[in-house]
C-alpha cells in the first residue's frame, strides 16, 4: 500500500501558491483494507475515504471507461492492481496529473512540470474528449492562472471544440454546469473563462444569449470598445479587480443580453434593451438554476442599470420608486450590490476604467436618507395600514427632495 499526494496540491506547491486542500491517492489497497484502517467511505460513485484524523480525501487508484453521455457516463474500476500512472492518465490536464510520494519525491509521467514552466494548460490524453465537463474546468483553470501567463494549448482547445460541436455539453446537468460557472466567475480573470468558452464554441452551447453579443456594436461615444461582447468581458474584469461577490458578477455577465435582440438596422442604438433582455435573463436563470440571490439581482440589474447611470437626473419620485422596487428598506444589501454592478458597467469601458462614478455615492446616500425617515411619529398619530404606508412614502419623498437639492448638480 502506497500513498501519494496528487493534483492541485502538487501543482500549486510547484507554482508557489497557497495550498487550500490536499487530495491523496492510494495504490495497492482495497476498500476493505481502508475500512480496517479506520477510513470513512464517502464516495458514491467510486471508492473515496476520509482520513480518520485529518478528514482529507483518500481515493483508491482507479481507471475509467466511457459508457454513456455526459459527465456521469463513465464506468470506474478500482483495485489494488491499478498503478499510479494509470490513475494519473485519466486526469484532465498535465499540470493536474503529478504526484508526490511520502518522501516528497515528484512523480510526473506526463510532462506536468514542463507545462507549468511553459505556462501551458494541456490535456493528458485523448480521453480528455470523453468528459464534457472538462471544457468548463479548463476554461476555469485558464481564468485562475491567466495572471501567471497561462494559456490553453492549441491542441487542447481543438478537443474542447470537438466536445462543443458533438452536443455532449447538452448532457451536463444544470447543477454541474452552475458549479463550474460560479467558481469560474469568482476566479481572478472571469473574462478569460468566457473568452475561452467562446474560442472553443462552448459559449454558444451554454450561454448563447451572451455569445450573441459579440459583434453587436454600441455607440462609440459611450462605449469606446464598441463591441457589446468585448464590453461584457471588460465589465467582468472590473468585477474581479474590485472583488465583487458572485451575485454582482452574474448580473454583470447578463446585464446587456437584450442588445443581442436589436435588429441590425437599428444598430448601434439599443432602445429599450433593458426590458427586451428580461425574458432572456429569466430563461438563463432557470436553465442554469442560478441561486435566488444571483437570479434576482440579474433581473433587477438588467432592468434598471440605465437608471443607475442616470441617477443624478432622476426625479425624487422616480428615485423613491427605484428604492421601493429593490425593497431597500428591508434589503439594503441588494441595493448596494445593484449600485456596485452599475459602477462595474460604467468602468468596463475601454479607457474609462478609472473615471469617477459619482452615481454610486449618490444612490447609496439617497437610500440612507430615505431609510432615516422615522416611523414612530406617524404611529403616534394613530396611522396604520395603507394610510401609514402613504404617509411614510410622503415623508420619504420629502427627504429625497431635500437630498437631491443638496447633492445633485443643478
Curated annotation (Swiss-Prot):
This is Multifunctional CCA protein. Belongs to the tRNA nucleotidyltransferase/poly(A) polymerase family. Bacterial CCA-adding enzyme type 1 subfamily. Comprises two domains: an N-terminal domain containing the nucleotidyltransferase activity and a C-terminal HD domain associated with both phosphodiesterase and phosphatase activities. Residues 228-329 form the HD domain. Catalyzes the addition and repair of the essential 3'-terminal CCA sequence in tRNAs without using a nucleic acid template. Adds these three nucleotides in the order of C, C, and A to the tRNA nucleotide-73, using CTP and ATP as substrates and producing inorganic pyrophosphate. tRNA 3'-terminal CCA addition is required both for tRNA processing and repair. Also involved in tRNA surveillance by mediating tandem CCA addition to generate a CCACCA at the 3' terminus of unstable tRNAs. While stable tRNAs receive only 3'-terminal CCA, unstable tRNAs are marked with CCACCA and rapidly degraded. InterPro entries: CCA_bact (IPR012006), HD/PDEase_dom (IPR003607), HD_domain (IPR006674), NT_sf (IPR043519), PolA_pol_head_dom (IPR002646), PolyA_RNA-bd (IPR032828), tRNA_CCA-adding_enzyme (IPR050124). Its cofactor is Mg(2+); Ni(2+). CTP binds at residues 8, 11, 91, 137, 140. It catalyses: a tRNA precursor + 2 CTP + ATP = a tRNA with a 3' CCA end + 3 diphosphate; a tRNA with a 3' CCA end + 2 CTP + ATP = a tRNA with a 3' CCACCA end + 3 diphosphate. Keywords: ATP-binding, Hydrolase, Magnesium, Metal-binding, Multifunctional enzyme, Nickel, Nucleotide-binding, Nucleotidyltransferase, RNA repair, RNA-binding, Transferase, tRNA processing. One of its GO terms (molecular function) is magnesium ion binding.
